[in-house]
């Protein structure tokens, strides 16, 4: 998809959702990606994020940028600062699509407000215990602080993978024809049926 290669996308958060989504989009051909995250890789991240053991202590955004350059030649811009009221314009001004994958309500509220006020397309991807959402800014409601830390839940890589697959497909459809779909993913209710071959 030619539009994907040049379209400026900023991904907020390089944790389980953001890192895997950035990797998926880069491997699909996205070449104009920025990832914003102030955190360093911790050993606990290795089960759900595409980082390696010898990278513990490295900035997540920096590691992701290096990995994707080595893997597919994608030059992801790594922003290793905390997104806040003073710098949100600076870090999001070049984006035409923002994907919010932050794991806290304060940062999600900042992205929601900024994108709403500036009429900037924004897709929110989030998850909790057995449940994930992919929602465009117009319908999105920032979760309460009680639901903040994704690490409070029994985080499963399979739910991360499903959420990232749905989010990346949502981004690709949006870039192809402007389609804006909202999704909820409930792991418990997911049905996979056997294929009967005759």
Regions inferred by a protein language model and the residue ranges of each:
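Adenine nucleotide-associated cytosolic modules
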Residues: 1-198
